[in-house]
UniProtKB/Swiss-Prot annotation:
2',3'-cGAMP binds at residues 362, 514. The nuclease-like domain is most probably catalytically inactive as residues that are essential for catalysis in the DNA/RNA non-specific endonucleases are not conserved. However, it is required for the stability of the protein and the catalytic activity born by the phosphodiesterase domain. It comes from Mus musculus. Disulfide bonds join 90-104, 94-122, 102-115, 108-114, 131-148, 136-166, 146-159, 152-158, 177-223, 185-397, 413-512, 462-849, 596-653, 607-707, 609-692, 819-829. Ectonucleotide pyrophosphatase/phosphodiesterase family member 1: Homodimer. Ectonucleotide pyrophosphatase/phosphodiesterase family member 1: Interacts with INSR; leading to inhibit INSR autophosphorylation and subsequent activation of INSR kinase activity. Ectonucleotide pyrophosphatase/phosphodiesterase family member 1, secreted form: Monomeric. Changing residue 362 to Q: Decreases phosphodiesterase activity by 95%. 65% activity can be restored by addition of Zn(2+) ions. Accumulates nucleotidylated intermediate. This is Ectonucleotide pyrophosphatase/phosphodiesterase family member 1. The lineage of its organism: Eukaryota, Metazoa, Chordata, Craniata, Vertebrata. It is an enzyme of class 3 (hydrolase).
Length: 906
């Protein structure tokens, strides 16, 4: 290693004295000796001037000679080339002790005589990783982080942009955008490597708004595959989302549910600044570098949450313990160096992480000049990476995923909720502050599970008009959030409106007037960045939004790995790839499906319905269907195929009616689903069907099928899956929806929601979309894991009312499907559009603070809050939709995993 100031490989090196001065040359000493001889004669000559000594001219000649000699020596040993030309630049002179009209050594700063270009020539290259025209041809110094010297290629220490700046070659961003049809890799690369590159806190909107200032990222977007919004996981925090990206798991599944959390079973707390962060017990699931290790694929991680922790006893082959002070350029250069390792050492998968623009967003807010500067900085750094890949011949070989973990929101001190305002004494509780706040008792773990969270949630509900927070017992949170099934998630959580945060009191708040994140993952300002670029990705493609849990399966496909079990839908991102690797298939039906003919005899149901509404003889005739009738019914009621039953050992009757189709569970004695089509011009009748039921003789009769069972219950009643008022076939066809096979136990408070949905919203949706197909049914999720419960769990959670065992649903689902082309009806769709909802079934409507409100002011808002993916409905019901469609399964997975973004954040 050469010392700073020495020039490597160029001429002799001069020694220096201990005080930093150069040692005196012997030749100079001998030449200076005559100066001593000339001093005394000169003085004598001046005193003897009046006498005009004849030796005067000799003395003057000698003095003149000495002066000339002194000047020459000064030029040689002091001023050097400045004698011939005045030197005003430090180029080639950095940190040398040479004297001129300006200096370039470290002392010049204190002396105040530095050359004007000292800073940019000698100082900036010690921490700047790029060349400029002025640096080209500079003298190499070891203290420079990279070189722009003419021979830097030989020494392999060139700055990344040396070729474009000093050799007038095009940089990567200046080259034309070409489709990479086949990988163009160096011979030593058997297959394209993959790099996962995270720009923390890069809000999706940044690229929409400031793309013109970001030439490199914009080129990647235009030349690769891009989505306007990648949906993060909830809460939209750094550690949970980075770990979701590399595991394909929800935070509730992989255990990292927040940047700060408490585990009552471990009785330990996790934070980003604690040593507990390195405890492997916090990390569940299998990150991709562990997956790679199991399949003998090497990985290198330059920072990624979890990558410096022994998960399953495994670390990446190359990794760095997180240190935020490491310059961004150093991280990029390290990855480029790893790509040059011998093939037996070289990783095949890489991660790279930068803290910006998150850091600037937190400090100054998302709409600030500082964030714009941070965006331009990371754009230059991405350009540095691409230029480095180009120099290595990897710019058309490596598959790059440029990604972020979440967005950023502007905070306001006026948009903070403080619980002490409502609770008074708060000494017995602790709140994890923010937009996804959680509460637990201070006395943990002793009272963690026994604390009366329900009473506290009720106390904090509907305290004031237009309340900006909602307290939730976690089983009632929107199922799309998947934020319940973990002991690390406190039983009481808070859902905040856009831009709002919550803390126990003002002293515990943070990010009051600056940027923050963590809110609902459907809020537009929480959306993240995704760009895929490389030979595997499509050229110039823009795709619909998707969730970041899908990226793990995508990366496994790129690397040729078999994914570990995860929450993603493998194959749902096939449309991003030129040549998809994995070909998904529909799940196999597991339930026992049968036809159920009329067997039973009629009984008194204890109803008080007008006889003219349900003439029994005519009603029975309607159920005698021909084969042709059944075909027509299937075409009308399940145009995309009936839902398949994935519930193992489950016995289901398929019941056909003129207007709807039912999958009736003989195990639960209630319908699992009902399907019908609501055309644009269909109308609802005004008949009053309350207290009207007709016994379905095709199924066993249960006490829960009788009107009399519900008469004395003030809260529990029954509801119809298919609305009786929908009568679209003929005026002579009586409402088959009054059949006992169409009812489910339903709280009276929920009937308000259900009736408004049927009587008002479905009519409007059918008119707007030129008709809709509707599938609805009960949900049982007593263990709140977002998956259908086993028969054993259902039995444990059944209730006894009036000496009769009854199973009350925890939720109800609705799946609405229509055509993308509004000119088509639901019976002839060329392409589908869907929306799904999973509504909590609660004995009150306190969630919506409905007192004094009309249904029109809150029901649709509730539906929007509890919107879900079709995939979420499938997981929680054990059903599978759209299996008779002609589209590929991967195309259907795109449809099933879609969710719209909440764009209005007033």
């Amino acid at each position: 290693m050469e010392r700073d100031g020495d020039q490597a490989g160029h001429g002799p090196r001069h020694g220096s004295a201990g005080n930093g001065r150069e040692l005196e040359s012997p030749a100079a000493a001998s030449l200076l000796a005559p100066m001593d001889l000339g001093e005394e004669p000169l003085e004598k000559a001046e005193r003897a001037r009046p006498a005009k000594d004849p030796n005067t001219y000799k003395v003057l000649s000698l003095v003149l000679s000495v002066c000339v000699l002194t000047t020459i020596l000064g030029c040689i040993f002091g001023l050097k080339p400045s004698c011939a030309k005045e030197v005003k630049s430090c180029k080639g002179r950095c940190f040398e002790r040479t004297f001129s009209n300006c200096r370039c050594d470290a002392a010049c700063v204190s002396l105040g005589n530095c050359c004007l270009d000292f800073q940019e020539t000698c100082v900036e290259p010690t921490h700047i990783w790029t060349c400029n025209k002025f640096r080209c041809g500079e003298k190499r110094l070891s203290r420079f982080v990279c070189s722009c010297a003419d021979d830097c290629k030989t020494h392999n220490d060139c700055c990344i942009n040396y070729s474009s700046v000093c050799q007038d070659k095009k940089s990567w961003v200046e080259e034309t955008c070409e489709s990479i049809d086949t990988p163009e890799c160096p011979a030593e690369f058997e297959s394209p490597p993959t790099l996962l590159f995270s720009l923390d806190g890069f809000r999706a909107e940044y690229l929409h708004t400031w793309g013109g200032l970001l030439p490199v990222i914009s080129k990647l977007k235009n030349c690769g595959t891009y989505t306007k919004n990648m949906r993060p996981m909830y809460p939209t925090k750094t550690f949970p989302n980075h770990y979701s990206i590399v595991t394909g798991l929800y935070p509730e599944s992989h255990g990292i549910i927040d940047n700060k959390m408490y585990d009552p079973k471990m009785n330990a707390s996790f934070s980003l600044k604690s040593k507990e962060k390195f405890n492997p017990l916090w990390y569940k699931g299998q990150p991709i570098w562990v997956t790679a290790n199991h399949q003998e694929v090497k990985s290198g991680t330059y920072f990624w949450p979890g990558s410096d922790v022994e998960i399953d006893g495994i670390l990446p082959d190359i990794y760095k313990v997180y240190n935020g002070s490491v310059p961004f350029e150093e991280r990029i250069l390290a990855v480029l160096e790893w790509l040059q390792l011998p093939s037996h050492e070289r990783p095949h998968f890489y991660t790279l992480y930068l803290e910006e623009p998150d850091s600037s967003g937190h400090s100054h807010g998302p709409v600030s000049s500082e964030v714009i500067k941070a965006l331009q900085k990371v754009d230059r750094l991405v350009g540095m990476l691409m230029d480095g890949l180009k120099d290595l011949g990897l710019d058309k070989c490596l598959n790059l995923i440029l990604i972020s973990d979440h967005g950023m929101e502007q905070g306001s001190c006026k948009k903070y909720v403080y619980l002490n305002k409502y609770l008074g004494d708060v000494n017995n509780v602790k709140v994890v502050y923010g937009p996804a706040a959680r509460l637990r008792p201070t006395d943990v773990p002793e009272t963690y599970y026994s604390f009366n969270y329900e009473a506290l949630a009720k106390n904090l509900s509907c305290r004031e008009p237009n309340q900006h927070f909602r307290p939730y017992l976690k089983p009632f949170l929107p199922k799309r959030l998947h934020f319940a099934k973990s002991d690390r998630i406190e039983p009481l959580t808070f859902y905040l409106d856009p831009q709002w945060q919550l803390a126990l009191n003002p002293s515990e708040r943070k990010y009051c007037g600056s940027g923050f994140h963590g809110s609902d993952n459907l809020f537009s300002n929480m959306q993240a960045l995704f760009i895929g670029y490389g030979p595997a990705f499509k050229h110039g493609a823009e795709v619909d939004s998707f969730e970041n849990i899908e990226v793990y399966n995508l990366m496994c496909d790129l690397l040729g790995l078999i994914p570990a079990p995860n929450n993603g839908s493998h194959g749902s991102l096939n449309h991003l790839l030129k040549k998809p690797i994995y070909n998904p298939s529909h799940p196999k039906e597991e339930g026992f499906l049968s036809q159920c003919p009329i067997k039973s005899t009629s009984n008194d149901l204890g109803c008080t319905c007008d006889p003219w509404i349900v003439p029994i003889k005519d009603f029975e005739k309607q159920l005698n269907l021909t084969t042709e009738d059944v075909d027509d019914i299937y075409h009308m009621t399940v145009p995309y195929g009936r839902p398949r039953i994935l519930l193992k050992q489950h016995h289901v009757c398929l019941l056909q009616q003129q207007q709807f189709l039912t999958g009736y569970s003989l195990d639960l004695l209630m319908p699992l689903w009902a399907s019908y089509t609501f055309l644009r011009n269909d109308q609802f009748s005004r008949d009053d069907f309350s207290n009207c039921l007709y016994q379905d003789l095709r199924i066993p009769l249960s006490p829960v099928h009788k009107c009399s069972y519900y008469k004395s219950n003030s809260k529990l009643s029954y509801g119809f899956l298919t609305p009786p008022r929908l009568n679209r076939v003929s005026n002579h066809i009586y409402s088959e929806a009054l059949l006992t096979s169409n009812i489910v136990p339903m709280y009276q408070s929920f009937q308000v929601i259900w009736h408004y949905l049927h009587d008002t919203l479905l009519q409007r949706y059918a008119h707007e979309r030129n008709g809709i197909n509707v599938v609805s049914g009960p949900v049982f999720d007593f263990d709140y894991d977002g998956r259908y419960d086993s028969l054993e769990i259902l039995k444990q959670n059944s209730r006894v009312i009036r000496s009769q065992e009854i199973l009350i649903p925890t939720h109800f689902f609705i799946v609405l499907t229509s055509c993308k082309q509004l000119s088509e009806t639901p019976l002839e769709c060329s392409a589908l559009e869907s929306s799904a909802y999973i509504l909590p079934h609660r004995p009150d409507n306190i969630e919506s603070c409905t007192h004094g409100k009309r249904e029109s002011s809150w029901v649709e808002e509730l539906l929007t809050l509890h919107r879900a993916r079709v995939t979420d409905v499938e997981l929680i019901t054990g059903l599978s939709f759209y299996q008779d469609r002609q589209e590929s399964v991967s195309e259907l997975l795109r449809l099933k995993t879609h969710l719209p973004i909440f764009s209005q954040e007033d």
